[in-house]
């Protein structure tokens, strides 16, 4: 068995599991589980957007939530003004992408790199947070949509079947849409990364100077990667606004930005499946920690077990120390060492790991 | 009915569950009641007392034999100051736990997240926090006070005491914006003048420049509608600048987050506030309530807050309606509540106002005095006049929105 | 005139508080390339240490200037020995670990202290400038910041510890080859950074209040200041604080706090665009 075959098997496996998930979940689970999975799928698309930018493009973006939030706000504002969802959906992808392109041009053509990129992107998302947060007054509106400040925009109308605004997509429909979108994003990114473009951006990540000397312009390639990532995050934001019919400035906040980075680290950088797994795992954990709290106990144990940040913090620290490479690469290593004990050729796979996943 | 795998699984699960419960002491399954509040993160200072009060109310109900002969079970969700979790937990409460009622939401933002979800899945909702007013939704009941109930009383009281020129500092969100408009309205109506209204995002901690601006304006008193942990630093910096002695302050947000305990007496004594409930209210219902609260949560419990009492009263009102309806069915309970149910609560008589689904209740003006709140003046049975100006659910039962009230 | 003096004091105060909250992070990041996302929580712990000490009858000055830095410094050393030392050279992983640490510390303080903690009020009273009154404590904060920065300068410039620290910072391998023990230097550095954060948290506690989640209000700002300052710890922190602090405060005074905040952030973006290595990447290169 060679690397290529292994890669194809992995790809096939993801496809089969994904489609099985898509078809079976609404049949076997109650609506509340379906709704919960819907938001996990949406967030997983967001995780993939950073997986591309950071994991493959090597651009440490601490403000992915800026594009996510812009997507959600754009959809909400456009929806209140237009009333039919096709154009708002497109805008929710185009506006964040354009914003990412502008910001990317500003950064990459200014030769800003490394941790400075992180700070600029973080700063941008905090500016958006502060600005949107201070739009509580009635004078802040775009067309008929009030921005609402801290309280955000509630009651966002859902997507409809393109062209027919009287046929909104229902809750199960949203699940199918989100899951299908996630699968499409995953396979789309796999294709992209297998293409010439994908090879070049990974090459730039590995050694920017060398890629430049070979005649590729790293700035342009980074800009393109960043813009694609911004568009994906905006698309996820649009779906998110649909799922909760709601958007508020906390979507731009520090906690949200850090969360996206954590998904990618936990799942494993340099893979695509990893951030999906990390995202769903962390989301599930956050929800589980908040659900079914013991109430009113004043003894120590109750205080500790009811303390979501305490437990979550311990889990994260333990995770970094015990699973340093992230979930999926570590599982991959375990799998390979199992394989290696059977056949020696598996060893040759090791250096190629960066391109798989 | 089309039988597919899901309904099949559901019904077998139901049979299994019924089998399990038949052996218990209770004739039927417990009645599920959901609590959705922030118990960690920045807003836990408000959420924890609310859940404690709800816990006590439910334990009292169970000790008295439950509701309709059934136990009441609290399902307690911690939203961790995260809006996304409000949506998720509201969905779970309605669909998975099939609760009879949801008590929850702290900020108006969280309420507007929960409200449509519970409307969609037909689950009764109680919002127990003081807020800006204007929500008109037959599925929702609001037990907190609105600006017309408190600001209207406190403005003339403070103006009589201190003078006519007012400087308003307010949290920069819906509640602060609307409350400051009400302040302006009542100050003008009472022949005074608002010299300026300044808004601060909820995470601002540096108030130096503002304090200088206030000094330049020389108002007779300052009205604070500041909210949350960060804004406590305003009172600190105000006192540190030596301003507390020369310019007094009034507020309808101070002390909800126990600010009067966090700050030293030197920093806030003499401040005027106005709410529905104070722990030191002198009436027999309240005295026995405070005693049992302290027995349950310890006598060192810092303070039973306005929001905690709102939650306690919210549950009691709902329980009263369930008794009257003889059922936990949503529509029957709503109809029972709409008969204008009332209870003798620790804060005095509390009655549901049928057209607005808000409450008619007593309000009190108090003064901060050495970490306590000393009640100065009582106003019996205040109507939610602001919401009533826009909302009539008896005439338009299908109305469903939050009005922006013209001030 | 009196207004101008008052404004000048407030601008100085903004600069001083920004420098105070950033300098601990600057040391940890500058020397060790560790992005400490639990930095805000170190500041928060400093505040709690001061509160607990004063409530046990210790004078407020000793509580703030001695107890808080020692307590938080020790916590820093423990954190370095138990978590950070496994993660050197893995900048990204330290981010995840310190984010976890930050949540953990917030949860722990909430469990221990609850969320209604009696704070400490600012000592020293107030004084009059023309028509205005302002807090004398403001001047104290400015003084503390100046003293802290001066001490760091002296230590870095003229002591053996400073020499070793600068050496390790410039080239850890070389320093190691010359007989320096990097793990020990790192533990001390991390402890010192934490201690300075504890000091800053305690000194600012009477102004900003103390509650478990206050760290969030600090961490982004200090991070931006440190990066904006660039590689040199001291001159970087000072110059970036001076720039951002005065922009923030003047904008706040002229317009609103929101605009002040946005002006600070926008200034940071423009600064990094113009000077991609931070201020000291271009100016004061030979500074500390």
List PLM regions with ranges.
Chain C
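Alpha-helical transmembrane segments within multi-pass membrane transporters and channels
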Residues: 25, 58-102, 108, 239-244, ...
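Pore- or pathway-lining transmembrane helices of multi-pass membrane proteins that form conduits
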Residues: 41-45, 87-110, 215-227, 255-275
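Helix-loop-helix "hairpin" substructures at the membrane interface of multi-pass membrane proteins
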Residues: 14-15, 133-211, 234-239
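Membrane-embedded helix boundary and interhelical linker motif in transport proteins
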Residues: 9, 31-78
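Extracellular/periplasmic helix-loop junction at the C-terminal end of a transmembrane helix
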Residues: 99, 103-130, 253-260, 280-288
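Cytosolic-side transmembrane-helix boundaries in multi-pass membrane proteins
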Residues: 112, 170-184, 255-288
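Membrane-interfacial amphipathic/re-entrant helices at transmembrane-helix boundaries
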Residues: 1-20, 49, 58-65, 90-95, ...
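Transmembrane alpha-helical segments in multi-pass inner-membrane proteins
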Residues: 59-70, 187-197, 201-202, 207-269
């Amino acid at each position: 068995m060679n690397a290529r075959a292994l890669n194809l098997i992995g790809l096939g496996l993801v496809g089969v599991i994904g489609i099985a998930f898509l078809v079976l979940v609404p049949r076997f689970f109650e609506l509340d589980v379906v709704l919960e999975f819907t938001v996990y799928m949406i967030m997983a698309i967001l995780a993939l957007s950073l997986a591309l930018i950071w994991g493959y493009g090597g651009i440490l973006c601490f403000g992915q939530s800026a594009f996510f939030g812009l997507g959600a706000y754009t959809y909400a504002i456009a929806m209140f003004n237009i009333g039919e969802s096709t154009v708002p959906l497109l805008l929710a992808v185009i506006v964040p992408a354009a914003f990412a392109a502008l910001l990317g041009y500003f950064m990459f053509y200014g030769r800003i790199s490394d941790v400075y990129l992180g700070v600029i992107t973080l700063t941008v998302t905090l500016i958006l947070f502060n600005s949107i947060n201070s739009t509580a007054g009635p004078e802040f509106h775009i067309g008929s949509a009030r921005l609402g400040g801290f309280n955000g925009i509630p009651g966002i109308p859902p997507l409809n079947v393109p062209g027919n605004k009287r046929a909104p997509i229902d809750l199960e429909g949203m699940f199918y849409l989100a899951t299908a979108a996630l699968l499409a994003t995953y396979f789309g990114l796999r294709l992209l990364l297998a293409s010439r473009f994908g090879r070049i951006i990974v090459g730039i990540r590995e050694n920017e100077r060398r890629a430049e000397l070979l005649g590729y312009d790293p700035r342009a390639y980074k800009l393109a990667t960043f813009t694609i990532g911004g568009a994906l995050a905006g698309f996820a934001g649009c779906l998110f606004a649909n799922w909760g019919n709601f958007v508020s400035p906390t979507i731009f906040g520090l906690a949200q930005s850090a969360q996206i980075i954590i998904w990618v680290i936990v799942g494993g950088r340099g893979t695509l499946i990893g951030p999906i797994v990390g995202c769903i795992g962390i989301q599930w954990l956050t929800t589980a920690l908040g659900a079914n709290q013991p109430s009113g106990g004043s003894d120590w144990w109750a205080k500790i077990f009811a303390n979501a940040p305490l437990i979550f913090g311990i889990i994260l620290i333990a995770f970094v120390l015990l699973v340093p490479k992230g979930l999926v690469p570590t599982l991959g290593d375990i799998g390979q060492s199992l394989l290696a004990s059977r056949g020696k050729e598996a060893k040759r796979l090791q250096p190629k790991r960066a391109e798989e996943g | 009915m089309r039988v597919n795998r899901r309904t099949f699984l559901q019904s077998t699960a139901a049979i299994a569950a019924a089998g399990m419960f038949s052996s218990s002491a209770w004739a039927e399954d417990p009645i599920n009641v959901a609590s959705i509040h922030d118990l960690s993160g920045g807003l836990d200072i408000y959420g924890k007392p609310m859940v404690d009060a709800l816990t006590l109310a439910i334990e009292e109900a169970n000790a008295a034999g439950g509701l309709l002969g059934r136990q009441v079970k609290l399902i307690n969700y911690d939203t961790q100051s995260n809006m996304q979790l409000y949506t998720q937990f509201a969905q779970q409460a309605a669909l998975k736990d099939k609760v009879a009622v949801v008590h929850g939401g702290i900020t108006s933002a969280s309420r507007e997240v929960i409200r449509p979800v519970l409307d969609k899945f037909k689950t009764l909702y109680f919002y127990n926090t003081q807020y800006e007013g204007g929500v008109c939704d037959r599925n929702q009941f609001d037990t907190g006070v609105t600006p017309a109930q408190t600001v209207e009383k406190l403005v003339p009281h403070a103006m009589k005491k201190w003078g006519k020129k007012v400087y308003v500092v307010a949290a920069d969100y819906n509640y602060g914006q609307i409350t400051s408009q009400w302040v302006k309205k009542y100050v003008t109506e009472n022949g005074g003048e608002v010299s300026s209204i300044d808004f601060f995002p909820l995470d601002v901690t540096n108030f130096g420049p503002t304090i200088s601006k206030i000094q330049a304006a020389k108002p007779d008193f300052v009205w604070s509608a500041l909210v949350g942990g960060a804004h406590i630093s305003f009172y600190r910096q105000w006192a540190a600048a030596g301003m507390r002695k020369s310019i007094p302050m009034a507020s309808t947000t101070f002390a909800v987050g126990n600010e009067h305990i966090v700050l030293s007496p030197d920093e806030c004594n003499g401040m005027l506030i106005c709410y529905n409930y104070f722990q030191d209210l002198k009436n027999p219902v309240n005295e026995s309530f405070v005693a049992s609260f302290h027995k349950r949560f310890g006598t060192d419990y810092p303070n039973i807050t306005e929001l905690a009492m709102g939650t306690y009263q919210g549950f009691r009102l709902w329980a009263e309606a369930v008794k009257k309806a003889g059922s936990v069915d949503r529509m029957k309970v709503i109809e029972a509540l709409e008969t204008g149910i009332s209870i003798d609560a620790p804060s005095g008589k509390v009655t549901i106002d049928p057209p607005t689904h808000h409450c008619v209740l007593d309000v009190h003006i108090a003064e901060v005095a050495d970490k306590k709140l000393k009640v100065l003046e009582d106003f019996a049975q205040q109507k939610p006049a602001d919401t009533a100006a826009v909302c009539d659910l008896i005439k338009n039962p299908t109305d469903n929105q939050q009005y922006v009230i013209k001030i | 005139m009196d207004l101008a003096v008052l404004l000048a004091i407030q601008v100085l105060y903004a600069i001083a508080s920004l420098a105070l909250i950033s300098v601990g992070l600057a040391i940890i990041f500058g020397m060790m390339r560790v992005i400490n996302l639990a930095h805000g929580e170190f500041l928060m712990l400093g505040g709690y240490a001061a509160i607990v000490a004063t409530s046990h009858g210790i004078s407020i000055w000793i509580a703030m200037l001695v107890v808080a830095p020692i307590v938080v410094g020790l916590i820093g050393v423990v954190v370095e020995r138990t978590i950070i030392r496994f993660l050197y050279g893995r900048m990204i992983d330290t981010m995840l670990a310190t984010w976890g640490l930050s949540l953990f510390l917030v949860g722990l303080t909430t469990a221990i202290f609850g969320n209604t903690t009696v704070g400490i009020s600012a000592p020293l009273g107030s004084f009059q400038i023309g028509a205005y009154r302002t807090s004398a404590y403001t001047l104290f904060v400015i003084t503390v910041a100046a003293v802290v920065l001066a001490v760091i300068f002296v230590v870095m410039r003229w002591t053996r510890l400073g020499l070793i620290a600068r050496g390790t910072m410039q080239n850890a391998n070389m320093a190691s080859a010359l007989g320096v023990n990097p793990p020990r230097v790192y533990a001390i550095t991390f402890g010192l950074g934490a201690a300075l954060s504890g000091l800053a948290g305690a000194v600012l506690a009477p102004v900003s209040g103390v509650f478990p989640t206050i760290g969030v209000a600090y961490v982004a700002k200090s991070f931006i200041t440190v990066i904006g300052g660039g590689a040199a710890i001291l001159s970087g922190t000072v110059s970036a604080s001076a720039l951002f602090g005065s922009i923030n405060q003047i904008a706040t005074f002229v317009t609103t706090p929101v605009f002040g905040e946005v002006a600070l952030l926008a200034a940071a973006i423009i600064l990094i665009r113009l000077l991609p290595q931070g201020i000291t990447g271009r100016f004061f290169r030979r500074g500390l």
